[in-house]
Each structure stands twice: as C-alpha cells, then as structure tokens.
C-alpha cells in the first residue's frame, strides 16, 4: 500500500496582458495583501518568503523557498514547513509572452501528504485553489494600468523622543484607543493567536464622516502590519503598517498606507468626483488620522513615566 498521496494540478490561461506584468504580480510581495483577499502580509529573507493569510476565523502562517527565473518568467514557491498531514506543497507560475502583447499563464500546484483521509482532504484543499488563483491573476494583470491609478500609497514618519517599547505598546494596545485617540469612538479587539489581532473600530473623519472598519493585524517585533477586511464603501483594499526604527535619541515611527479606490463609489464624495479627487481626499484623511494617532503615541511615550 502506498504510504503517501501525491497530486499535481496544472491550469493554463491566455491573459490579455504582457507577461512581464503578470510575472511582477506574482513575484512582488507587496501586491499579495493588496490584491488577493486572503493575503495579509508577506516578507522575504533571502530566498525564504514568510506568509500570513486569512483562514477561517484566524490567520495561517507558513514559509516557502522561492526560486526565481526572471529570464524565463518563472517562479516556484516550495513550502518548507508543511504541517501534517501535508508533507510537501508547491506553487509554480510560468508566463510565455506572445507577439500580440498577450501571454500564456501556466499555474502548477503540487501537494504530497500522508495516505489517510485527512491527507487526501488536505491535498484536495490545496489544489482546489488553482482555478480561482489563475483567474484572479488574470483579472489583475488585464486591469493593471487602471489599478495603478486607483492605488494610493504613501508613508508618514514621525520622530518620538521616547522608548520604542512605549510607542510600540501604545499602538499594540489598540483596545485602549477610544480612551486615548479622539477620532476613535469605539473599538473591540480579540487576540486568540499571539501577535494576531482582529478588531472592529468606529472612527470619525475630520469632516465628521463616521466609518466602521474591521481589521486584522500581525504584530512583529519591528513592525505592526494591518489589513482592513471590513472596508469603508470608497475602498476595495486598505493595507499598511507601523514601522519602528530605534535611534540614539528615541524612535522614528513610520505609518504606511496603501489604499485601492473603488471607481464605482466615487459619487460618495460628490457627483463630479474624479479619481484624482479621491486620491487627494484619501491622502489627506488617512494621513490625518494616522498622524493624530502617532502624536498621541508621542505624548504618551515622552511622558517621564514612559520615556
């Protein structure tokens, strides 16, 4: 009797997009949380990529070894820490350019497991994503030029003459923000996995607009990453982080935002609102709110009791 279950699924599709664009989408890790609904965060360390993704009511974390062939427009991600019953899994993308500016995308998913009911179910679950995944990459690639216009990305740094621990603690303890940050009117938070937070937050913009959002956060030692999973009506996606850089005098905290505008929701800002108008609005509102939060963190961390 075989002691393992091994399966491979391959899907191909013709994309009305250049091969180089499609290749960038699956290799530039910044795109994953922004354009893929389950993606929360990914970071690279040499050829190792660490991933965090929504799964059920929680977050799954794993690592893969990435093998890049840029000239061949091919990338392979081999998981290095498979949990039983899976014993191996991988995803490979290959893009073949065509003379008319389109390309053929080929996606190959492989999974091995223990030869058991649980193993076969795990393999089937891994391979079931093939159709959805190649369709999603095609949709993104074919609308890439428009998407670039709809994405607002910026960073706001602030120096704080206090300890990194105090600032990090202020931002980590988001459930205390309604007492500490005026534009946050209510917030409920859970942390069932260490360092993984889910919270529902009510905020008010400078114009008095009320928003309710739901977010997931990954709290790493040097960075707190977030992704909104319950979004305001104007946005298709909103991701970002708080990054901490300790200096001899204190800490520089950088608030990063990447937001994708919904073009069919522009009228929420007025009948004649353009994408450029919405970009300016988001840059102002998101920056104002995050800098307000940082300035309250600054006041907290620079108090003698916390400095």
Language-model features, listed with the residues they occupy:
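Aromatic/basic-lined ligand-recognition segments
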Residues: 190, 196-205, 210-213
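Beta-strand/loop substructures that line and gate deep hydrophobic ligand-binding cavities in soluble
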Residues: 3-8, 55-56, 61, 78-137, ...
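Short, structured motif recognition centered on aromatic/hydrophobic residues
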Residues: 23-26, 32, 92-94, 103-105, ...
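Hydrophobic, helix-prone linear segments
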Residues: 1-74, 83-88, 288-307
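Extended Gly/Ser/Thr-rich low-complexity repeat segments
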Residues: 65-70, 211-221, 267-274
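A short, structured loop/turn motif at beta-sheet edges
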Residues: 19, 44-47, 67-73, 94-104, ...
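Hydrophobic ligand-binding cavity/cleft-lining segments
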Residues: 1-46, 131-193, 307
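Short Pro/Gly-enriched beta-strand edge/turn motifs at strand-loop
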Residues: 47-49, 72-79, 197-199, 221-228
């Amino acid at each position: 009797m075989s002691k393992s279950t091994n399966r491979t699924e391959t899907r191909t599709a013709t994309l009305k997009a250049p091969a180089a664009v499609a290749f960038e989408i699956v290799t530039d890790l910044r795109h994953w949380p922004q354009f893929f609904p389950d993606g929360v965060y990914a970071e690279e360390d040499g050829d190792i990529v660490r991933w965090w993704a929504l799964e059920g009511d929680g977050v799954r974390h794993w690592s893969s070894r990435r093998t890049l062939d840029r000239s061949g427009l091919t990338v392979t991600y081999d998981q290095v820490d498979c949990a039983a019953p899976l014993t191996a899994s991988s995803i490979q993308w290959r893009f073949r350019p065509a003379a008319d500016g389109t390309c053929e995308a080929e996606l190959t998913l492989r999974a091995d497991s223990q030869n058991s009911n649980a193993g076969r179910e795990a393999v089937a679950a891994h391979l079931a994503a093939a159709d959805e995944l190649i369709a999603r990459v095609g949709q993104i690639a074919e609308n890439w030029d428009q998407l670039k216009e709809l994405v607002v990305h910026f960073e706001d740094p602030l120096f704080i003459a206090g300890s990194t621990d105090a600032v990090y603690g202020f931002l980590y303890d988001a459930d205390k923000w309604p007492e500490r940050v005026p534009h946050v009117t209510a917030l409920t938070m859970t942390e069932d996995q260490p360092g993984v937070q889910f919270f529902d937050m009510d905020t008010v913009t400078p114009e008095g607009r009320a928003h309710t959002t739901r977010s997931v956060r990954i709290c790493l030692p040097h960075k707190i990453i977030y992704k909104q999973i319950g979004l305001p009506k104007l946005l298709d996606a909103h991701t970002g982080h708080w990054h901490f850089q300790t200096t001899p005098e204190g800490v520089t905290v950088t608030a990063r935002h990447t937001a994708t505008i919904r073009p069919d929701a522009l009228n929420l800002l007025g009948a004649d609102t353009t994408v450029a108008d919405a970009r300016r609005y988001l840059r102002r509102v998101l920056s104002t709110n995050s800098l307000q939060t940082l300035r309250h963190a600054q006041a907290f961390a620079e108090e003698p009791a916390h400095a």
